[in-house]
Amino acid sequence: MTAAVVAAAATATMVSGSSGLAAARLLSRTFLLQQNGIRHGSYTASRKNIYIDKNTKVICQGFTGKQGTFHSQQALEYGTKLVGGTTPGKGGKKHLGLPVFNTVKEAKEKTGATASVIYVPPPFAAAAINEAIDAEIPLVVCITEGIPQQDMVRVKHKLTRQGKTRLIGPNCPGIINPGECKIGIMPGHIHKKGRIGIVSRSGTLTYEAVHQTTQVGLGQSLCIGIGGDPFNGTNFIDCLDVFLKDPATEGIVLIGEIGGHAEENAAEFLKEHNSGPKAKPVVSFIAGITAPPGRRMGHAGAIIAGGKGGAKEKISALQSAGVIVSMSPAQLGTCMYKEFEKRKML
């Protein structure tokens, strides 16, 4: 068993308690399947579903609830092509002028939905994700925070054994293509169509990076909040692969935080795939430099355990991959602008 598998199993046990051992073993088997190339390739192929635009048809799970109603209204006002939603037992009714369905499968069949956003309470969110996977919705964005980690281990096991559905989240702000499609809770007005791809584990720091890249005139091509939980559906590498292949994305902002190995893995990916004269500039900020070991800092995944997952190690790994690491989130925009200026990209 590799160090990554051991670390993931330890995290599952730590987060879920001793009863998490079974879930940890399940996750370990999932990682081993990925490493052996079994089915992992099919889920990787779903990265293409991360691209959203003005033609993306979105449904909302938890449509008639308080959060679903508020954020669906915001999405409609932004111009997102929201085509309906689901609330079990309320099928056949109208909400916000759109049809309500009992199941995701029915919603997809009737509307042609290509994406779903989930605003379902934590105890039921994993079941909502699984329902979307079973309905083969291409992109599922789960906003819900506080989903039991054992539930997400099982969801991840299911995800990595198929290739039709891509999950972003949970515990994330969502994804936005400025001016075209907003799926999530981010404030639309701070975004501006532009040249920078942003990926982040932190929601509020995503907004900070967005505001700054807007202020310096660079704007954003696509912004993805991958969430702060240990077991999510999309990681840094998935998003970096999308950004590196996207001609509209000329620079990348990566915002990480303490806990796990996602940033170190991203650094290795960038070393291999973003080097040479045509490499895209990457600017990063890692939150939690002063965080004490063993204490969870906000997100379930933001914890330094067993001497691993510290900010200094992540910063060192990213710098070795040619990433410009800002020591302050307030400098992300200016760091990227200076790099564009240096490369004569303005």
Curated annotation (Swiss-Prot):
One of its GO terms (biological process) is tricarboxylic acid cycle. It comes from the Eukaryota. The modification N6-acetyllysine is found at residues 54, 57, 66, 81, 94, 105. It is found in: Mitochondrion. Heterodimer of an alpha and a beta subunit. Different beta subunits determine nucleotide specificity. Together with the ATP-specific beta subunit SUCLA2, forms an ADP-forming succinyl-CoA synthetase (A-SCS). Together with the GTP-specific beta subunit SUCLG2 forms a GDP-forming succinyl-CoA synthetase (G-SCS). This is Succinate--CoA ligase [ADP/GDP-forming] subunit alpha, mitochondrial. One of its GO terms (molecular function) is GDP binding. Belongs to the succinate/malate CoA ligase alpha subunit family. Keywords: Acetylation, Ligase, Mitochondrion, Nucleotide-binding, Transit peptide, Tricarboxylic acid cycle. Substrate binds at residue 207. It comes from Rattus norvegicus. CoA binds at residues 64-67, 90, 143-145. Pfam families: CoA_binding (PF02629), Ligase_CoA (PF00549). Residues 1-34 form a transit peptide. Its EC number is 6.2.1.4, 6.2.1.5.
